[in-house]
């Protein structure tokens, strides 16, 4: 009834499975079009709908997404606080490999342990619950300079893949560029069919002291909402994980919102696009009802 309520988690790791998620259809700005994704149903881990004056205190807990998922949704809510927890993914939809050896027509790469692969007809395929890809987009990362570039993908012109041992692969090419030892490739497909978090038609929202160790297929999208604060949040790979990438594209996307958008005391590392993006919302007219409607 709108009276303030605080929900506290017992510290620990809470695995949220795609198969058991809340499945709700949402149209979200800057995500995959209906041509590529005719069913934009989101698979939601933490779902708050039409709630008022609720605080979710994770008390240091981790919400671990298992599968391609939207970690949280706040829909038509007011006065909501999410604080003191971590968001991570068991098998991030961006895979990573490090070059151990290079020849004129081959690479030997170390696969990050969170990246699942299979070899089908000598071709390499990455996969998880609800997703897979064989081609896609890549960026390359240099640990020494800590620089990342949009780059050639080790999935291009691939003739065959051989597993030398678990998580070590021999990749043979028809042709390839010189890439350099210990280059790390961050690979993904181009489909933004889920987001990390979604704040929709809500107001007075605070995200506080949250570690976003991985941000799904898109960042936290705030759409048609009002007065949002992001304070002391960390958007970066989990320390000690060995991962170098934390997100598909933008980390925070603010679309068609109003009031005060206050992002402060926060850290952004490892995005494949902008850390913060604020803009209007493109809407396609599908029907004219009358001269004034």
PLM regions: where:
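Acidic Gly/Asp/Thr-rich repetitive segments characteristic of extracellular carbohydrate-active
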Residues: 1-8
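All-beta strand scaffolds that present successive hydrophobic residues in beta-strands
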Residues: 9, 55-58, 79-84, 181-182, ...
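Extracellular beta-strand-rich solenoid/capping regions of secreted or surface-exposed proteins
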Residues: 15-55, 64-83, 91-105, 191-202, ...
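Short, solvent-exposed linear motifs at loop/edge-of-secondary-structure regions
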Residues: 45-59, 260, 265-291
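Autoprocessing Asn-cyclization modules and mimics
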Residues: 88-146, 277-293
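Long, low-complexity, polar/charged, intrinsically disordered or flexibly structured peripheral segments
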Residues: 130-201, 206-216
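Long amphipathic alpha-helical scaffold regions
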Residues: 225-260, 289-292
């Amino acid at each position: 009834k709108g009276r303030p309520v605080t929900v506290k988690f017992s510290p620990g790791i809470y695995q949220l499975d795609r198969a058991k998620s809340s499945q709700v259809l949402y149209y979200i700005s800057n995500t995959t079009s209906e041509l590529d994704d005719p069913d934009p149903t989101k698979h939601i881990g933490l779902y708050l709908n039409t709630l008022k004056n609720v605080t979710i205190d994770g008390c240091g807990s981790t919400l671990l997404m298992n599968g391609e998922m939207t970690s949280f949704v706040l829909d038509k809510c007011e006065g909501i606080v999410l604080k003191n927890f971590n968001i991570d993914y068991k098998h991030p939809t961006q895979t990573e490999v490090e070059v151990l050896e290079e020849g004129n027509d081959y690479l030997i790469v170390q696969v990050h342990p969170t990246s699942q692969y299979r070899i089908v007809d000598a071709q390499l395929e990455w996969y998880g619950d609800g997703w897979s890809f064989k081609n896609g987009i890549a960026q390359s990362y240099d640990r020494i300079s800590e620089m990342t570039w949009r780059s050639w993908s080790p999935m291009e012109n691939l003739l065959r893949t051989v597993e030398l041992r678990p998580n070590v692969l021999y990749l043979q090419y028809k042709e390839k560029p010189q890439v350099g030892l210990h280059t790390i490739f961050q690979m993904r497909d181009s489909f933004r069919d889920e987001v990390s978090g979604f704040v929709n038609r809500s107001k007075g929202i605070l995200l506080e002291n949250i570690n976003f160790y991985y941000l799904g297929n898109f960042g936290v999208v705030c759409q048609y909402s009002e007065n949002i604060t992001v304070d002391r949040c960390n958007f970066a790979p989990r320390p000690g994980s060995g991962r170098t990438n934390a997100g598909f594209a933008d980390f925070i996307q603010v679309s068609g919102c109003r009031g005060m958008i206050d992002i402060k005391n926060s850290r952004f590392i490892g995005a494949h696009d902008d850390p913060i993006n604020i803009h209007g919302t493109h809407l396609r007219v599908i029907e004219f009802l009358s001269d004034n409607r």
